Amino acid sequence: DMEGSAYRIREVWYSYPDNKCRARQSYTRKDGRITEKDETSTSQIYDMLSIMLKARTFNTSQWKPGKRINFLMTDGNGVKNQTLIYRGKQRVKMRGGNKAYRCLKLSFIETNDRGKEKEVITFFVTDDANHIPVRLDMYLKFGSAKAFLTGARGLSK
């Protein structure tokens, strides 16, 4: 990843020995220094992409806005406790079109070393059997960015 003049390569390899989740991690800095870590947990360990995919399986029918989902996440430089917050349901209009979806709204929260929480990504998945991610709002150090679904095929409905 790149952020300003910082350049990093983050890699994670997953395996599941003895019914545990093992995350072998490599973190390469711009100057070539490499940090490797190997962490194992009885709980599943996620990365940014896999936690969004996991959100597609959530049954939120009994959830109230504000529900917190705690999980372990690797960033290639270690495994940390992280949080998703269910924000409720919202109608999301797509960019430049007439299309709108009723969505589940979830926020990915990072907690710094002092315990202060910061919303990093808000993502929206359709509130139907498909649970398709249709929008991401990312809050970056240098501003913000949004990503929108532009098409999908093979959906169940």
Regions inferred by a protein language model and the residue ranges of each:
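Acidic, serine/threonine-rich low-complexity disordered tracts
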Residues: D1-S26, T60-K157
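Hydrophobic, well-structured mid-protein blocks that either form specific transmembrane helices
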Residues: Y16-F58
